[in-house]
Amino acid sequence: MNIGINGFGRIGKTIFIQLLENKLVNIKAINIPGFDINNIKIYLENDSIHNYNKSWNITINEDNSFNVNEKKIYVLNNRDASLLNWGQYNINYVIDSTGAFLTTDSANKHNVDYVIMCSPPKDNTPQFIYNVNHENYNGERIISNASCTTNCIAPVLKCILENNEIENASFTTIHATTASQNVSDT
């Protein structure tokens, strides 16, 4: 399975780290608009949250790619999904962690077989949460994995609902700022 990752912030980077050593998956390219590939090694090695695997040998190539051990991964630089030529790298699955392509129509611009959104959609794109409703997946080309908050609370609520009734619920989520949010330092 050949994967492309669109967006390389906290979610995209975490997905990259988790999938890199999966033998069933080949990460062929990541799209990081405005990113200098020469910083990729520093970006991966210096993460105070997710420690990278110290056995990784990261090298930068001259063709806008880098290697992690023997795996070659291209770095793309485009905000327009319709201009990303994922097919050039034989990519058939794109994991979109940008939060920018949140409708089936906009996700279709990736022009690949399957797209997984890492945010809740803004239309009726189906949402699947593992251990909640993933068994309802029926081959849809474009899906959403909902939000990180939903992925945290939905399995807990499902467990409670299997044996109890919930009249109402309240929870608080504390979330890191995202790239699109302004941080006020007063």
Indicate residue ranges for each PLM-predicted region.
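N-terminal Rossmann-like NAD(P) cofactor-binding subdomain of oxidoreductases
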Residues: 1-183
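Anionic-ligand binding region
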Residues: 186
